[in-house]
A protein has these predicted regions:
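Sequence-level preference for short, compositionally simple segments enriched
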Residues: 1-153
Length: 153
């Protein structure tokens, strides 16, 4: 079943979500807590394709999630479908299916200044790579902005 890909706020908890390419897509503010996201082998692409509108505070937030897949080094955490995509992944286990660079710019060099792809205290083989310079590693203080209470209050 599909969730709407429109502006709005969505909350997913203890959910299993799978897909091939861009299976988390759209412009909503969506908070994923303790979810499992499986990249299927036929996809070989991207978990997220954020399209947050300019000025929207949040995009996709993943907290205490598991990113799994069967084929090593075949997927990215995300790419910017639109120039202001926002994806933050915190405290999550990243499998070895995620490429070392983690994020892809989809040949949108100008988006390096406008997208916000960030990580915080992730672990696992896919979290250990060298991320692009235009992505962010959050500090403890910055990560507080991405709690459930901060996003939905």
């Amino acid at each position: 079943e599909f969730a709407p890909r429109i502006n709005g706020r969505q909350y997913y908890k203890n959910t299993y979500i799978c897909g091939g390419v861009d299976f988390i897509f759209g412009s909503a503010t969506a908070y994923f807590e303790n979810c499992t996201l499986e990249s299927l082998p036929e996809g070989g692409g991207y978990v997220t394709a954020g399209s947050s509108p300019k000025g929207q505070t949040y995009g996709y937030i993943f907290n205490h999630c598991r990113f799994i897949g069967s084929e090593p080094n075949t997927c990215y955490l995300g790419r910017p479908w639109r120039e202001y995509a926002k994806v933050v992944i915190l405290n999550s286990k990243i499998g070895d299916h995620i490429k070392p660079e983690g994020w892809h710019d989809w040949s949108k060099i100008d988006a390096h200044d406008t997208v916000y792809f960030a990580e915080y205290k992730n672990y696992g083989p896919g979290a250990a790579g060298a991320r692009p310079s235009w992505t962010h590693t959050l500090t403890d203080t910055e990560a507080e902005k991405y709690t459930y209470a901060s996003v939905f209050n």
